[in-house]
Amino acid sequence: MTLRNKAFHQLRQLFQQHTARWQHELPDLTKPQYAVMRAIADKPGIEQVALIEAAVSTKATLAEMLARMENRGLVRREHDAADKRRRFVWLTAEGEKILAAAIPIGDSVDEEFLGRLSAEEQELFVQLVRKMMNT
């Protein structure tokens, strides 16, 4: 196996391990849903399209995810009165409750993996990933 193939193979394994751990600890909340809920909590009433980056998804996929979350009572969406194409999103009381319970668990899962690295290694890891993503 070439170094290039090995690196990406190991990254896939790492993400699969992290996802499996996440699903075990938070079976009712996907990582993208969690990220979107964190973004909404940081900016209540955020415009729906601004959540695309947090969800790491397309506009259509995000809209579907938010519709499912709305049906579960986690978020509330409202159209802009002046422009019906624009929607704004808030967490519901239930969404706030679920997020508050999920944050320490999500942080713990992330720390389980990142904690294997020193603080310097964590910073280098982030820098290298950003460099590879060209951001």
UniProtKB/Swiss-Prot annotation:
Q: Which domain of life is it from?
A: Bacteria
What's the source species' lineage? Bacteria, Pseudomonadati, Pseudomonadota, Gammaproteobacteria, Enterobacterales
Q: What is this protein called?
A: Transcriptional regulator HosA
Entry keyword set = DNA-binding, Transcription, Transcription regulation, Virulence
Entry annotated with the keyword DNA-binding? yes
Annotated DNA-binding residue span(s):
48-71
Instruction: Name any one Pfam family assigned in the record.
Output: MarR
Instruction: Enumerate the spans annotated as HTH marR-type domain.
Output: 4-134
Q: What does this protein do?
A: Involved in the temperature-dependent positive control of flagellum-driven swimming motility and cellular aggregation. Regulates fliC expression by directly interacting with fliC promoter.
List the GO molecular function terms: DNA binding; DNA-binding transcription factor activity
Family matches, as Gene3D superfamilies? Winged helix-like DNA-binding domain superfamily/Winged helix DNA-binding domain (1.10.10.10)
Q: Which PANTHER family match?
A: TRANSCRIPTIONAL REGULATOR, MARR (PTHR42756), TRANSCRIPTIONAL REPRESSOR OF EMRAB OPERON (PTHR42756:SF1)
